[in-house]
Amino acid sequence: FYGQWKKTGFGEKGWAKVISNGKMGDGPWGNVFAGKAKGGDAVSSLKPASDEIKLAKGFEAELLYTVPKKEQGSWVSICVDDKGRLITSDQGGRGLYRIDVSQEEAKVEKLQVDITSAQGLLHAFGSLWVNVNGKGAGVYRFTDTNGDGSYDKKESIKGLNGGGEHGPHALVLGPDGKHIYVVGGNMTKLPQMDRSRPPTNWGEDHLLKRLPDARGHARTIRAPGGWIARFDKDGKNWETIAMGFRNTYDMAFNIDGELFAYDSDMEWDAGTPWYRPTRFYHVTSGADFGWRTGTGKWPQWYP
């Protein structure tokens, strides 16, 4: 019946019975209109990982390490290096950490690099690639030139203009093993590219006047909004793959090499006609997923 309710003379005959999934405010989301979400029961103490995670048959979850927030911050990105160790980054100014989980007890060391606030980490092509969000935003490459376990060479690959929760985000190795994919939120200005798959003549024209966000969020941000691009193993030949995202944080390829991403809309717009619920995107080449500021975003039924 999708779309038929707009037609003259439409009747409700044939509609299925309404199914209730719970009252507004039930977990896990909480009441989004109450000012403070309280969905579900608060976790008063740390539980084993298996008690917190739903696992498929045959899988197990193990708690490896509990991050002391006061000393090591809030870890917001993670990757695996060429020796199977984890590398993570604090969201703020507490730096990068390397975690060896090969023994019964995890060994954690702070990396001696002058960088922090990485929301994208990837070890590929013999180097650590870092996407910094905030001061000094941009993509960097760190290399251990003498094999002593320390990253002694730092290179700025491309500076980015953006930061905060909608700034530069994930780095992912492409399925061809030759390219690195990078994503930027809608407050990350699209940098100079060598080529673009989406047409670059995007516009902001509307038949009806747009209503900007009443609280001022992203009022001055215009197309292309959030974007996904890629570059080669030397950090060159940047190419825009898709655009029109709001704040996609991460992405992944399936076994067939198809790219998928996850996005969300402004949470305080929930219940309005222009709200677009959280969703997965099948990121096809050259796509524009239609985020525009305020009420100017493209409706879900646009092709």
Tell where the protein language model's regions lie, with residue ranges:
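Accessory carbohydrate-binding/adhesion or oligomerization-edge regions at the termini
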Residues: 1-39
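Beta-propeller domains with acidic blade repeats across secreted/periplasmic ectodomains
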Residues: 39-303
